[in-house]
């Protein structure tokens, strides 16, 4: 698996994002549409949005992140508060190296749910890739504090902190 790709949650390490159980959908009064399927009372638009989301996840799982990002962007436009859709969109954007966009998607989740460790992790990785290791370290530290047993969280934090340390040493050694 390449360093910039999204893999399965259980197989990711270092600077990779991956799938997790998506119990964060906010479409139907707090219940997860993933477990129960589409609500029979939902409109055709919501059914279409759910189909876009499921197809986007399928494409993402098969390594077609660019196609997934297109579908997931449409789903997100229809359901802008859905954290499940935003997470999948952020993963697709990260995999297609659209790190600013990925950071934006993960930031929306973090703003709505600061205790979402995976969103903190995704935001941290995306910020690291945009060249902001200071902000990245903050979010990765939060993720690692929330889930210290997840090695890829602590590995990513260690990597970003090493980058910050190296930059600080260079600044100290470089005469102005």
PLM feature spans:
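Alpha-helical segment of the N-proximal tetratricopeptide repeat
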Residues: 42-78, 95
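Long, contiguous interaction/recruitment modules in multidomain scaffold/adaptor proteins
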Residues: 1-51, 176
């Amino acid at each position: 698996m390449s360093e910039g790709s999204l893999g399965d949650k259980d197989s990711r390490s270092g600077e990779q994002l991956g799938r997790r159980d998506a119990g964060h959908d906010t479409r139907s009064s707090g219940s997860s549409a993933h477990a129960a399927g589409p609500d029979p009372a939902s409109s055709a638009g919501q059914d279409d949005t759910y189909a876009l989301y499921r197809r986007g996840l399928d494409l993402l799982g098969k390594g077609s992140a660019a196609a997934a990002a297109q579908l997931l962007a449409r789903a997100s436009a229809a359901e802008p508060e859905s954290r499940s859709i935003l997470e999948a969109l952020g993963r697709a954007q990260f995999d297609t190296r659209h790190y600013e966009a990925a950071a934006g998607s993960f930031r929306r989740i973090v703003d709505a749910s600061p205790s979402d460790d995976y969103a903190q992790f995704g935001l941290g990785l995306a910020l690291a890739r945009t060249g902001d290791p200071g902000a990245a370290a903050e979010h990765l530290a939060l993720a690692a504090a929330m889930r210290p047993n997840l090695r890829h969280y602590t590995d990513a934090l260690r990597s970003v902190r090493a980058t910050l340390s190296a930059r600080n040493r260079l600044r100290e050694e470089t005469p102005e």
